[in-house]
């Protein structure tokens, strides 16, 4: 409806329905649990058998009572986490980060909740930020406004950047972890002041970041 660039996808309500679609898929594909999964409900599936196993695990309760799954086109690019804060009227860019989810060296392991991150993303630039705002953030906020949702808080857009173009992979209405552990140390503005402003009628604070790079590693 709002022409936000994303992967081609389908939503499915049963194992049987999902397995029928696999015969038409070009691999690799992405299989996602529709619901909270601590950042672990995404499978990058290289084969039909791997996809079948992922679908069965989700519907059999690995992430709780999943009622739906998403099967998506696999987008090959570089991930970026892009954050804004909104007080329901205006918004400000809160920063970028790059999260590394796969276990083991060389991305050979399974997806995790996050093995580590750094901020800012190495892809960050004024040109790319402008595209993200115009193609993803502002259409999203317009969509929320159109359904009378005055969104207040943090909006985290999980993006795939392909040839300097942003594609939306997911939203979270929170700060990511471990991403927040790399963004917050870079803030010069008091974090409590930011939170107070979000839920009051005070003018949006001026966000200031240190000109540093912050990293986080999980062991």
Q: What spans do the regions from the language model cover?
A:
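Residues within well-ordered alpha-helical secondary structure of globular protein domains
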Residues: 24, 57-60, 197
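Short beta-strand
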Residues: 31-34, 72-73, 209
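Residue-level signal for inorganic ion chemistry
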Residues: 32, 113, 219
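Short, flexible turn/loop "capping" segments at secondary-structure junctions
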Residues: 34-35, 111, 212
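Internal nucleotide-binding/catalytic subdomain
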Residues: 41-181
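Conserved, structured core segments of small domains
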Residues: 165-166, 177, 184-199
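A glycine-rich beta-turn/hairpin centered on an aromatic-Pro dipeptide
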Residues: 199-219
């Amino acid at each position: 409806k709002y022409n936000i660039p994303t992967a081609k996808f389908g939503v499915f309500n049963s194992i049987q329905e999902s397995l029928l679609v696999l015969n038409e898929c070009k691999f690799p594909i992405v299989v996602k649990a529709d619901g909270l999964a601590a950042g672990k409900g995404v499978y990058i599936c290289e084969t039909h058998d791997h996809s079948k196993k992922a679908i069965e695990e989700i519907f059999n309760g690995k992430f709780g009572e999943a009622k739906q799954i998403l099967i998506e086109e696999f987008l090959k690019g570089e991930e970026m986490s892009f954050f804004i804060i909104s007080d329901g009227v205006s918004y400000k860019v809160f920063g970028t980060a790059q999260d590394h989810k796969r276990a083991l060296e060389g991305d050979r392991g399974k997806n995790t909740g996050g093995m580590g991150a750094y901020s800012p993303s190495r892809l960050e630039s004024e040109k790319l930020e402008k595209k993200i705002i115009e193609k993803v953030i502002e259409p999203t906020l317009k969509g929320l406004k159109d359904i009378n949702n005055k969104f207040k808080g943090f909006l985290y857009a999980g993006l795939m950047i392909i040839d300097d173009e942003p594609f939306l992979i997911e939203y979270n209405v929170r700060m990511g972890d471990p991403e927040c552990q790399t963004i917050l140390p870079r803030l010069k503005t008091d974090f409590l002041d930011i939170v107070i402003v979000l839920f009051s009628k005070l003018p949006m604070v001026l966000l200031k970041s240190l000109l540093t790079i912050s990293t986080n590693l999980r062991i």
